[in-house]
Amino acid sequence: SGVIRFAGEEIRSLPVLELRRRMGYAIQSIGLFPHWSVAQNIATVPQLQKWSRARIDDRIDELMALLGLEPNLRERYPHQLSGGQQQRVGVARALAADPQVLLMDEPFGALDPVTRGALQQEMTRIHRLLGRTIVLVTHDIDEALRLAEHLVLMDHGEVVQQGNPLTMLTHPANDFVRQFFGRSELGVRLLSLRSVADYVRREERAEGEALEERMTLRDALSLFVARGCEVLPVVN
């Protein structure tokens, strides 16, 4: 038991319809309407809120561009899209009415690793651009560490520990937390929380495939091993 507050108000004191209008929701099964086009799916909530046709069309175009969906997909149906494209449409629909909070329940769990990684990067970019609060439920530890600014770890319905990812990894509250994040993988996961930009030797020059400053040290280490080298250039 406990209390959930939304914008400072206990949610049970707010009308359900008002709550729904202030939140977007994206789930693992996506839940697109199969008989509606991409554009119609994205427009679902704005239409319910009786936006003008012109405003809805502009919002569809804006979100498709934001999520990397080509304009020629606008009139296609869900069965004509890849899994990654369907998930992007699902996120676009969740964002369509510009909600204050985006709820995501295992949104990338059914996708292949490459598509999942690409969408995780997209969500990080979208979060930076829009500044919206995103509440993400996941069982993927690395996904949580990659995406979250604040983590809440639960066990049997109770909060075991919460805090930023670095604190959770380096100062676990108890042995359950320590085991959950993996004793043997702790070092590698810590690399996921630090960026290349913090360790650049700007006075040196190097040749080879360039790293990006925003990359994590974990991704950079992977490239070092794959290329069999100890030094690589960095671009911003």
Regions found by a protein language model. Name each.
Residues 96-100:
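A short, proline-enriched helix->beta-strand linker immediately N-terminal to the Walker B motif
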Residues 162-163, 171:
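ABC ATPase "signature
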Residues 10-24, 48:
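ABC ATPase NBD coupling module
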Residues 47, 54-72:
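Conserved ABC ATPase "signature" region
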Residues 77-81, 85:
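Conserved ABC ATPase signature
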Residues 102-105:
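Catalytic Walker B motif of ABC-type/P-loop ATPase nucleotide-binding domains
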Residues 36-43:
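Short coil-to-helix segment of the ABC ATPase nucleotide-binding domain corresponding to the Q-loop/switch region
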